């Protein structure tokens, strides 16, 4: 459908921008993204999650804040349950779930919706690249 084709194009723009960024980063600080397509699979491109390898939650929050200052709303998906108020009230402690925290600590989700133009996607990835290079 037209919507899925548009999402494919948007993801391709993001991937190209991040691949270019990674060429300038050391191996420890590579930005990882979910491979949405392969010979045996193709996702709906519902979310565009990236992992800022080797970065702390504070550094990721800095990126999120800088993106917001430029009018770009990012998000953090899949916050670990032990970090949510209801679970804390039952005594869950994120320190007991280091793998969950590790997956959360350097993740950010870039905007990906069909109301965006290709120019919007370019704006997002250009700013993301600039901000991450500044870390």
Protein language model regions, located:
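PLP-dependent aminotransferase class I/II
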Residues: 1-135
């Amino acid at each position: 459908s037209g919507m899925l084709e548009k999402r494919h194009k948007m993801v391709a723009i993001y991937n190209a921008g991040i691949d270019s960024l990674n060429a300038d980063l050391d191996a420890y600080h590579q930005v990882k993204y979910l491979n949405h397509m392969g010979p045996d699979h193709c996702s709906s491109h519902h979310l565009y999650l990236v992992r800022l390898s080797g970065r702390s939650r504070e550094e990721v929050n800095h990126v999120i804040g800088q993106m917001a200052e430029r009018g770009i709303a990012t998000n953090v998906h899949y916050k670990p349950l032990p970090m949510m108020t209801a679970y804390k009230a039952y005594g869950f402690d994120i320190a007991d779930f280091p793998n969950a925290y590790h997956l959360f600590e350097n993740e950010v989700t870039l905007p990906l919706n069909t109301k965006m133009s290709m120019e919007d996607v370019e704006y997002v990835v250009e700013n993301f690249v600039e901000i991450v290079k500044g870390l």
